Amino acid sequence: MMWKTVLITIFAAGVLADDFSQITAVVTSQCTKNNAEDKVPEVEAALRTFGNCLKGLVDLNVLKTEIEEAKPNGALDEVFKKYCDKSAQLKGCISSVLQGVRPCVGNEYANHINDAQNSTNQLIDFVCYKDGDRIALFIAEGGPECFQQKTENLKTCFLNLKQSFPTVESANNLSLVEKCAKVDEMTSCIVKSLEECSTPTPANMAESLIKFMRKDSPCHTALPKTD
């Protein structure tokens, strides 16, 4: 499901960029692959609606300006409270687009759409805990800069996981415990990379998020962790 979620993210990025020409080609290809050519207009409409929904919730340029203006005044929490108050609407946007692309993701992945929705809801809840205190602290402590500095290291972490699952067939041949172990290796790699930054907050935040999301995943019972 991971790569299908990435695909949806790419769709969304195109929608937000107001460049639908590239999305049309990808949607057509994906729908054709799953014998759902007739669903192309329906999926495109869902993606357009998703893009408009997101634009109605946040203007990224405005948000960036608000963050920069709030940093010197220590008012980041006020900025994120305003946006976290819209989290229920954001969850609705995501739910709608996940259901909207269902006809073109194939039966194997369609069965995991609810899991994807639960995961994104958990992510939103984590980020917006206490009206966004976590994300405010993350930015105030140089989190984005840390991620930027460690981009290549993080890419390596993801690439190592991808090489463990080069094909759908190879992934299916692994047991759940084996899959969870591979994912745990990747997340440990991420945290270790971020620990090299000048402040501990980015690594601590990433580790907390990973633990938070793992707790409600099949890996929590299949491969329990004591720490």
From Swiss-Prot:
<dbReference type="InterPro" id="IPR009832">
    <property type="entry name" value="DUF1397"/>
</dbReference>
<dbReference type="GO" id="GO:0005576">
    <property type="term" value="C:extracellular region"/>
</dbReference>
<comment type="similarity">
    <text>Belongs to the UPF0408 family.</text>
</comment>
<feature type="glycosylation site" description="N-linked (GlcNAc...) asparagine">
    <location>
        <position position="118"/>
    </location>
</feature>
<dbReference type="Pfam" id="PF07165">
    <property type="entry name" value="DUF1397"/>
</dbReference>
<keyword id="KW-0325">Glycoprotein</keyword>
<keyword id="KW-0732">Signal</keyword>
<feature type="signal peptide">
    <location>
        <begin position="1"/>
        <end position="17"/>
    </location>
</feature>
<feature type="glycosylation site" description="N-linked (GlcNAc...) asparagine">
    <location>
        <position position="173"/>
    </location>
</feature>
<keyword id="KW-0964">Secreted</keyword>
<protein>
    <recommendedName>
        <fullName>27 kDa glycoprotein</fullName>
    </recommendedName>
</protein>
